[in-house]
């Protein structure tokens, strides 16, 4: 998803560290692996919800070129049940309820959902809660940016070289 816009060049300084302590290498590799696994878990949930909402949209707005997406119906039912409870709690607190169909899954909802379901990648004892929340927040921001870019693409396709692509899973890394 690239915009054709002139941007100022950005300069980066790259610092390479040669870590000789085997315990530190193992620790950093383990943290990177856990973080990567959580990232892929959040991406999976976000993608499944996106597929579901696209099917709902095109059921209401038929299009001859649309091919329905496959999605995990059990996961969607579980998410919808948790969303209902989430919005009920917000209503009790006199807060605005979240429209998940229009806005997708936000990081705060996913945080509550993962804690409630005991998602192993999120509640892992080795990965701190702060890191887990940050990973969830970053992936949610990526999907929010994707939806915004996709909407803008359909309004102004000339600004883009190609249609924005759905965020993909991270590859598993073997070592640092």
Where are these regions (language model features)?
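Nucleic-acid substrate recognition interfaces
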Residues: 1-176
């Amino acid at each position: 998803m690239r915009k054709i816009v002139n941007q100022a060049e950005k300069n980066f300084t790259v610092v390479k560290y040669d870590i000789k302590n085997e315990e530190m290498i193992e620790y950093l590799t383990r943290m990177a692996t856990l973080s990567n696994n959580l990232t892929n878990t959040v991406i999976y949930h976000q993608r499944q919800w996106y597929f579901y909402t696209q099917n709902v949209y095109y059921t209401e707005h038929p299009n001859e070129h649309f091919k329905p997406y496959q999605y995990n119906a059990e996961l969607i039912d579980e998410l919808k049940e948790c969303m209902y409870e989430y919005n009920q709690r917000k209503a009790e607190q006199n807060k605005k309820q979240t429209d998940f169909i229009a806005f997708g899954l936000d990081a705060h909802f996913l945080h509550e959902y993962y804690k409630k379901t005991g998602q192993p990648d999120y509640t892992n004892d080795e990965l701190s809660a702060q890191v887990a929340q940050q990973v969830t927040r970053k992936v949610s921001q990526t999907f929010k940016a994707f939806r915004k870019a996709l909407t803008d693409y359909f309004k102004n396709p000339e600004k883009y070289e190609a249609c924005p692509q759905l965020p993909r899973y991270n590859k598993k890394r073997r070592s640092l």
